């Protein structure tokens, strides 16, 4: 379903972001991307939803190649990919329901299908009773649930999550992570970048660790005892406050 082959990414100012990165993600798999800030996690995620293209190598996702994809190919591909960010990226002047509905409207979804789809995903994330609330009326955990609902409404085959619990307290983190686990159990692949090593250690999901743009560990190929991340990573805290669920 997803394959990276000898992928490298270089930027004119910052230099090498990725080097010789190769791995595959199977249908329905849950994969953690870990590593210190600047190790290449977010760069990989951007390549997966083709916000950027590799300098060398190739990214294959759902039959689309980064080397040959047209703009239309990428547009259609993104409709099948759910993306969740650390800072939620909600429209502040729209309700939870309207934020989710917008993701369908921009794809030209039939109007008759929009309301039931939105209701379904808001129920799935546990926010049916707060559909008309605006982001400012929701906690951080609830805002992230709205963002997840928005990512799910187009029935993606993979959910890409970039530090989805990074701005949440422990209680909200557990709740959001359990939601991601439930989504994965229902058949959607999840690729999650995180600094939260406690979360990783408590899970049995595949873990790929990056450092200086290279893969230094992949639990699919190495025993768990070989994991190199014994010490906490340096974490960048964004200005968004940590809120409870």
Identify the meaning behind each predicted range:
Residues 49:
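Helix-to-loop junction immediately C-terminal to a conserved catalytic motif
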Residues 57-66:
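Conserved ABC transporter NBD signature motif
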Residues 66-82, 185, 227-228:
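ABC ATPase NBD coupling module
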Residues 94-102:
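Short coil-to-helix segment of the ABC ATPase nucleotide-binding domain corresponding to the Q-loop/switch region
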Residues 134-138, 142-144:
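Conserved ABC ATPase signature
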Residues 153-157:
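A short, proline-enriched helix->beta-strand linker immediately N-terminal to the Walker B motif
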Residues 159-162:
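Catalytic Walker B motif of ABC-type/P-loop ATPase nucleotide-binding domains
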